[in-house]
């Protein structure tokens, strides 16, 4: 392959013993997928309009204080909740577990390990449990939701990017190793990872439970903060249409990155910022990761192809800005590896 001495997924022989986690394939409770995210927003109507008209999500229900939205193929009541607040925050990211018994098992597991957790009543959801993971990420588990009609065949209602379903989250954390170990212990499997050059020090990890490349991503940075949440779209033309609609609705300058193609996950992508600067990704074409003999793909942090296969790199704000969780201290990262940014690229050219 031109300009490349070995495939990016080959682990160099000179590296020290691996720091990669061992996945627990019989976890204490069963997580099935990324499910729903809740955001605190300062202008509820403006945020609703952005996600409905510029992104293309379906409004399931709204009140004076909250708006519930979903993708076109989703039967669950919501995958995005917007809540009116004085200050913009990422309230929590949600994961589904298989049954009500898994919520009880999670309570038992966290109690035995001193992990703070709370059973809560949440509108439109079944048994729900909130906790913080090993690096302070605010998590909500639920075993069920009210169901609504899928809109995937209502092609006359497709607008903007026509998002199909919520797929994953990316969280900036001060300690990628601790975060990765925590979730591997709960059954998540590493599909790809970025390491500090010449080492297996983890700079970023892509972890999955549903058989594609990621449900939950951790990257090195000040955290915990929610970098983005992501929805699949039908194809590449919908990414371009989403960009056109963003320009037409006054959000052209809020296109944060792309369109482009990641090396990690192989996805075509487009990132946008909402009126409170929360970041959403629309993407398509990632791959299956199911067979247990598949090893995780490794990338050097200095390799620009990991983040973008063509075009210029992302700006500093894409790498370093993210949404904080309420009341959660933000810590400086343990690693100092710094990705190449658009500003770095322009200074050299």
Language-model features, listed with the residues they occupy:
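Surface-exposed interaction/gating patches
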Residues: 161-253
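Conserved short beta-strand elements that form part of the metal-binding/catalytic scaffold
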Residues: 57-90, 137-146, 192-227, 233-236, ...
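Core segments of cupin and vicinal oxygen chelate
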Residues: 29-76, 120-123, 130, 171-213
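Vicinal oxygen chelate
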Residues: 9-27, 33-42, 85-174, 193, 202-207, ...
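A cross-taxon signal for low-complexity, glycine/charged-rich
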Residues: 1-10
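Conserved active-site tyrosine of GNAT-family acetyltransferases
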Residues: 47-52, 110, 136, 179-184, ...
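The feature marks the first
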Residues: 12-49, 53-108, 112-118, 323-349
